[in-house]
Amino acid sequence: MKWHNPPPRWTASEGHLTLETGDQTDFWRETHYGFIRDSGHFFHQEVEGDFTATVRFSGEYRALYDQAGLMVRLDERHWLKAGIEYTDGVQHLSVVVTREFSDWSVLPLTQPPDEVTLRLSRHGDAVRVEYALGGPAFRMLRLAYLPPGRPASVGPMACSPQRSGFVATFRDFQVGPPISRELHSPE
């Protein structure tokens, strides 16, 4: 695995990654704000074809837009990041899909979890985003398009657009064969 924008401080050992973000880091392209940011921290590996990636993570969310989760990246103009983002004083499940321009969807969490498990599955032109809060049952959060037939980088990401020093911890990151394409099959 390698870094796209290594953070100023990080440690990794035995399936455990902890990082502290640099100042005003983010991934975003154009929409609403009119700027491009490609300064977030992304610890990734390259994957060919279809796959499923899973990670458990937590963060010390305190400032506007503090965020942690998983990213799938084809290049600087085509990517998806998903996880927790702190906005309006609340943790939100968050997905940003970028195909030249970024979009953003959020779901507020009234009971902030200690840890979130996130699962991203790529099947051709689709990336399915699923989450689990405190148990083994995954729920779908988003189904998004990313151009098929291109290698992708996938791995943990974290950003802090309004500050430095956001601490995020990731555990048990795994990439393997894709789960079933069926969106509504029981697990």
Predicted regions and their residues:
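Extracellular glycan-recognition regions
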Residues: 1-187
